[in-house]
């Protein structure tokens, strides 16, 4: 199965993935695959396993069972270079995961300098380009405490992009941002999608999903309940659990 999928250009193959914390099984046998440049949105109620799933993909949470194959290589903690995996898979978290004592420019340049041994001037030059990309050139010398939540999250996105990832994971990137500022982050993500970035996005932003997603996966209780195009999942959901969830989200 894995070999056939990879021969068709799959960047990610997840097979029968399980994750338990003690006696609590959070992911209960999830399987899916992704093409290069595909945009995948994960949706579902709180506690459905969405965030745990993306954290298993880049080995922040090692799976309890199952297989993750990324870019043609089976990911195993003892055989695969996990640090290299995290260079190739960028992640943006719910909270603004930026260093409070560093400026926006320093936050973005740090990874390439420390991990990839890029020359400081070159790293800072690219950091300025990335700040422009996310609309924050004027914030280069500002520290996180001097920026809004939306600005901090855009710095976090730029910092992940500085490592030139092959896949970007977004774990509810707008959940901690004031409603009035959510569009700042979503606009950047739409731009990345338009440029062909391969993305997995955990979100409840249905408008974003309709605009960007090639495919939507709906999860509940650690399982994939439904999967399809945005039109199929949002306009013609087949499962009662999906219908119930969407009716509540759309009324919120």
List where the protein language model places each region.
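C-terminal boundary and immediately downstream tail of ABC-type ATPase nucleotide-binding domains
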Residues: 231-252
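Pre-NBD coupling/linker segments of ABC/ABC-like ATPases
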Residues: 1-6, 242
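ABC family nucleotide-binding domain
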Residues: 7-14, 18-230
């Amino acid at each position: 199965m894995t070999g056939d999928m990879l021969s068709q250009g799959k960047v990610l193959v997840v097979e029968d993935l399980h994750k338990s914390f003690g006696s609590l099984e959070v992911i209960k046998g999830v399987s899916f695959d992704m093409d290069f440049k595909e945009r995948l949105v994960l949706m579902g109620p709180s506690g459905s396993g969405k965030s745990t799933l993306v954290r298993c993909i880049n080995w922040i949470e090692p799976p309890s069972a199952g297989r993750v194959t990324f870019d043609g290589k089976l990911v195993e903690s003892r055989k695969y270079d996990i640090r290299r995996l995290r260079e190739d898979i960028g992640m943006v978290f719910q909270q603004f995961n930026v260093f409070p004592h560093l400026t926006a420019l320093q936050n973005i340049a740090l990874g390439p300098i420390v991990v990839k041994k890029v020359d400081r001037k070159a790293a800072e030059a690219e950091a300025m380009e990335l700040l422009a990309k996310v609309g924050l050139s004027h914030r280069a010398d500002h520290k996180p405490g001097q920026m809004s939540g939306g600005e901090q999250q855009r710095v976090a996105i730029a910092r992940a992009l500085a490592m030139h990832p092959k896949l970007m994971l977004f774990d509810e990137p707008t959940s901690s941002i004031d409603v009035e500022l959510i569009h700042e982050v979503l606009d950047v993500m739409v731009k990345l999608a338009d440029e062909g970035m391969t993305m997995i996005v955990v979100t409840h932003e249905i408008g974003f999903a309709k605009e960007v997603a090639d495919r939507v996966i709906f999860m509940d209780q650690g399982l994939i309940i439904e999967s399809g195009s945005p039109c199929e999942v949002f306009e013609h959901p087949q499962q009662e659990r999906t219908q119930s969830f969407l009716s509540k989200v759309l009324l919120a």
